[in-house]
Amino acid sequence: MTMMTLFIITLTLVSCDEEQQIAAQLQGHWSGEIRTKYDSFRGVSGGNYYTVFRFNGKPGSRGGHGYEIDYANYRYETRTRIKENFNYSVADEIITITYEGGAIGKIRDYRLDGNTFEGYLDFQNQSIRFRLEKDDQYRDDPYVHGNY
């Protein structure tokens, strides 16, 4: 019985460590193109988006807060920027993003290393393929909609 208890505790601690490690790797800015058509809950739709994700969390945590900025290009006529703040958590190899408006996205089947973050974001009945690169040079844009 004692060995079984130690085994269960060990499995629990390993799982927690992995989730904390994933949350730690997410820290910072990630940017890149999303090439798909979708409608955001603010009404923006289009085919090509340059997207920036910012993840902030405390050391040792399994989540935190951040934001997503979509730079939409409509037939290259105008450039629209929409910012959405969110909270995120890591559990069971899924990154769950809960946006301020209540919408929920789930990132699955992802690969995350020091420079690349790619996978699928399931959001509003769509699966959006993304590939982002670590972007330590990104600076916040004070003129983004939603950044009041």
Question: Regions from the language model: what does each represent?
Answer:
Residues I34-T36, E68-N73, T98-G101, Y120-Q124:
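Beta-turn initiation residues at beta-strand->coil junctions
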Residues M1-M3:
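Bacterial N-terminal signal peptides that target proteins for export
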Residues V90-T116:
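Acidic, glycine-rich flexible loop segments
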Residues R54, T80-D92, T116-Y148:
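Edge beta-strand at a domain terminus
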Residues G28, I34-R35, D39, G46, ...:
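Start-of-domain marker
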Residues L11-S15:
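C-terminal motif of bacterial Sec signal peptides marking the signal peptidase cleavage site
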Residues C16-E33:
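N-terminal helix-cap/turn-to-beta initiation motif at the start of protein domains
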